[in-house]
């Protein structure tokens, strides 16, 4: 299940308040799982192997790393919204570093694009610094065959490229002043459209190392939709395997 930042803070409050016995805390960056296990004591190794067996490699090799509250009676995993930079372990429930992580005020670029509509914005934490949204007509698909279909396809392809060019131009204009400071760029819309747009936009290609793997769910790009993206960006995946009786 997906938790908002606020809901995740409430979960951390509950964990802190109850201080469940024999629950260890693990924070593991991407690509560090095997080494993290090697560096563990026998008790931690047992818990970490159990996590791997119960959650699977898809979780332990997450693109943003893994946070775990794990013991004999408590088994909770978190997939954070942004990459974990530092590994740590505690033989008790420890939420301070996670809270600091969630309170970061990242500078984030957002591009929402579907065929016909777009929205581009810059956020510092939850605050929007600059944005632009709009539309550009793109014909729907043509079901008939023959010459008319080919002509229609050429027109549609041209319109799509014109949309991509416009969105790329706006993205470049809005994000260039923040280029060196940007922490991440998130994109939202249909995966196929996003991939094709990314291939045609030099600015996006130059920022490849800043592009987040996760695609933001977007119904229809607009300023209103853009303003809702921080809550989506900061959502964490929570997997509750066991919750102790309180």
Locate the predicted segments by residue.
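Terminal alpha-helical anchor/extension segments at protein ends
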Residues: 1-246
